[in-house]
Swiss-Prot record:
Residues 11-57 form the G-patch domain. Residues 9-32, 84-94 have a biased composition (Basic and acidic residues). Residues 131-141 have a biased composition (Low complexity). InterPro entries: G_patch_dom, PINX1. This is G patch domain-containing protein 4. PROSITE patterns: G_PATCH. Residues 1-32, 84-110, 124-185, 197-323 are annotated as: Disordered. Residues 252-261 have a biased composition (Acidic residues). Residues 294-306 have a biased composition (Polar residues). Residues 281-291, 311-323 have a biased composition (Basic residues). One of its GO terms (molecular function) is nucleic acid binding.
C-alpha cells in the first residue's frame, strides 16, 4: 500500500487512515510478522476485445513497414545479363501484407489437421510416443522462431542506439543544424510571468474580499448580542427622566394636600386669612394649572422617542416535521 505517483481514490485513503490508527506505516507488510503484501491489490479493467496474452504495446515495438520491405526484398533477386537487368522472384509466397507481427502458430492455421495435437506415431510393431518438450523449452523455441520470422532491422535497437546512429538528431527539423527549443520555452516563461503579474493581485484581492464579509458578520453578531443583553441608551435616559418627574410630582402633590388641609382647617375655625396667604394660594393654583397643561405634550414626546429603540423580536425556529 505504498503511495503511488497518481491521486489516490477515496476508498484507498480511508483504508490507509484506518491502518495508520493501528500502527501501520507505508512500506510495511501485512500480518503479525509484517511478511504480507505491502502494496494494494489493483483491479485491471479490460476494455478491449483482444484475447488473453495480447500485448497492447506491440503496435509501437513492431516495425511492420521495415519487416514488409525486408521480406519483399529477400524474395526478389536482381541479375545482370547482356540484355540488361532481370528481376526474378525467388519465393512463391502469397502472404498478405499486414501490420501484425508474424507467428508460427498463425502460419499453420490452414493445415488439415493443424488444430490437433500429435501424441504418437503408428508403426507396424506398435506406437511410438512423441517426446513432449518442457514448457520452458517450448516457450523459448516458439519465441526464437517468432523472432526469426520478424525481418525488421530495428527490432533490437533501443532509442539510445537510434539516437547515436542518427548523430543525436531528433524529428525536429532544425535540430540537425544545432537549433533547440530554448526560444519557445523562454516565450512561454514570459507569458506565465505576465499572467501572474496581471491576475495574481486580483486573486489576492478576491480572497481579501471574501474574508472581510465574514469579519463584518462576526462584529454585527457581537453587537446584536450586546443589544439583546442590555437596553438601548435612549430608553435608559427616558426611564431616568420619568423617575425624576414622578418624584417631583409626588412631592408637589404632598405640598398641595398639606395646604388644602390648612385651608380647610382655617375655614372650619373661621379664622380670617391674611393677604400674603391669599396671594400664595393663588400663585400655587396658577402653577398647578400650568403644570397640568405642560405635562401632556411632554408625555407624548417621551412616548415618541421611546418608539425609535424597540428591541427586535427574536424569530422562533420552526421545528422540522420530520422531528
Amino acid at each position: 500500500m505504498s503511495a503511488s505517483s497518481g491521486e489516490k481514490s477515496q476508498g484507498r485513503r480511508f483504508a490507509e487512515q484506518q491502518m495508520h490508527k493501528h500502527g501501520w506505516t507505508e512500506g510495511k507488510g501485512l500480518g503479525r510478522r509484517e511478511n504480507g503484501i505491502s502494496e494494494a491489490i489493483k483491479v485491471k479493467v479490460k476494455c478491449d476485445h483482444a484475447g488473453v496474452g495480447h500485448n497492447s504495446a506491440e503496435q509501437f515495438t513492431f516495425h511492420w513497414w521495415d519487416h514488409v520491405f525486408n521480406k519483399t526484398a529477400s524474395s526478389i533477386s536482381v541479375e545482370a545479363d547482356q540484355d540488361g537487368v532481370k528481376v526474378n522472384r525467388t519465393k512463391d509466397d502469397d502472404a498478405p501484407v499486414t501490420n501484425k507481427k508474424p507467428r508460427k502458430a498463425l502460419s499453420n492455421r490452414n493445415m488439415l489437421y493443424g488444430r490437433f495435437v500429435k501424441s504418437a506415431t503408428l508403426l507396424p510393431g506398435g506406437e511410438q510416443a512423441v517426446k513432449e518438450p518442457s514448457s520452458s523449452e517450448s516457450s523459448d523455441s516458439s519465441g526464437d522462431e517468432d523472432e526469426k520470422l520478424d525481418l525488421s532491422s530495428a527490432t533490437k535497437m533501443t532509442d539510445e542506439d537510434l539516437r547515436k546512429v542518427c548523430g543525436g538528431r531528433t524529428a525536429h527539423k532544425g535540430a540537425r543544424h544545432g537549433l533547440t527549443m530554448s526560444a519557445k520555452l523562454s516565450r512561454l516563461e514570459e507569458q506565465e510571468r505576465e499572467f501572474l503579474a496581471k491576475y495574481g493581485n486580483k486573486q489576492q484581492k478576491d480572497k481579501v474580499k471574501a474574508v472581510t464579509p465574514e469579519i463584518t458578520e462576526d462584529l454585527l453578531g457581537k453587537n446584536r448580542q450586546q443589544n439583546d443583553s442590555g437596553e438601548c441608551p435612549e430608553t435608559n435616559n427616558s426611564h431616568k427622566k420619568k423617575k425624576k418627574k414622578r418624584e417631583r410630582v409626588d412631592s408637589e402633590r404632598e405640598e398641595e394636600e398639606e395646604e388644602e388641609s390648612q385651608e380647610n382647617r382655617h375655614e372650619e375655625e373661621q379664622v380670617p386669612l391674611s393677604e400674603e396667604e391669599i396671594k400664595s394660594s393663588k400663585k400655587k393654583k396658577s402653577k398647578k394649572k400650568h403644570r397640568e397643561q405642560s405635562a401632556s405634550p411632554q408625555e407624548e414626546q417621551v412616548t415618541e422617542s421611546t418608539d425609535f429603540c424597540i428591541k427586535p423580536k427574536k424569530k422562533k425556529k420552526k421545528k422540522n416535521k420530520s422531528e
